């Protein structure tokens, strides 16, 4: 069923500061105290979805205008860690958690349209197995520098063995950074073709920054995978850093109104 028929409670974060953070605007304690309170009185709550960008405190403590523009729902600590917002006193996570780091209502609408489109695409082709083969395909991207190639590829091969032999039954294709450097455009074309045809997940392991991976995946406008959106799992430094005033690579891709991906996870 479209949307999953969840029972949803919408909470305005600005109403929590007085009740759970001693009136301190933008303080992460408000959310943490609130979710611990909710766990006691509403034990069946399972998922938390934060809608709104957050900032690390160091980015706005000397400039309150940044707080108003970007710290719409605060994160916890430095570096920012949303899971700690939903942890108990023993730092045990209470709920599954995600964040859509938007600053404009139009970005929420764009993302919602992509979710609806993706669900409609899957629900209307679920019984046509040939058309759903793309949902069993996974791409692995092995980055890093020469001293790490063997190690990173070994880790990805271990993940490949698991996802191909468990109930998911995936078909995994691995692209290597050193191979891409040798084969150039030919390797990139194969990667683009796979994404355009549809994959369920792309996993990257290598060096990264907030705005870039060390594997060329181009920008969202380069792809034509409309409806066949995937999850991108990035295992690299700062790949998921969304608590700055500028947009990260994950935000640019997830919030794109064009195509490419639906969700970005990082470790």
Where are these regions (language model features)?
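Cysteine-dependent hydrolase recognition
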Residues: 1-267
């Amino acid at each position: 069923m479209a949307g999953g028929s969840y029972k949803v409670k919408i909470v305005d974060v600005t109403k929590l500061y007085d009740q759970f953070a001693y009136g301190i605007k933008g303080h992460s304690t408000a959310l943490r105290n609130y979710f611990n309170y909710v766990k006691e009185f509403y034990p069946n709550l399972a998922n938390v979805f934060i809608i709104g960008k957050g900032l690390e405190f160091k980015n706005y403590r000397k400039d309150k205008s940044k707080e108003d523009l970007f710290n719409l729902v605060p994160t916890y600590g430095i570096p920012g860690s949303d899971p700690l917002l939903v942890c108990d006193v023993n730092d045990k996570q209470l709920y599954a958690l995600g964040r859509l780091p938007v600053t404009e209502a139009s970005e929420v609408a764009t993302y919602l349209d992509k979710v609806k489109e993706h669900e409609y695409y899957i629900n209307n082709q679920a019984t046509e197995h040939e058309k759903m083969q793309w949902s069993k395909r996974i791409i692995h991207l092995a980055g890093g520098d020469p001293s790490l190639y063997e190690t990173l590829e070994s880790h990805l091969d271990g993940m490949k063995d698991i996802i191909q032999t468990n109930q998911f039954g995936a078909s995994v294709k691995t692209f290597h950074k050193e191979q891409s450097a040798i084969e150039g455009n030919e390797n990139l074309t194969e990667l683009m073709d796979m994404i355009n045809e549809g994959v369920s997940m792309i996993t990257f392991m290598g060096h990264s920054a907030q705005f870039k991976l060390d594997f060329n995946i181009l920008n969202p406008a380069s792809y034509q995978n409309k409806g066949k959106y995937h999850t991108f799992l990035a295992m690299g430094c700062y790949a998921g850093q969304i608590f700055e005033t500028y947009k990260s690579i994950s935000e640019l891709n997830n919030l794109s109104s064009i195509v490419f991906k639906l969700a970005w996870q990082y470790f």
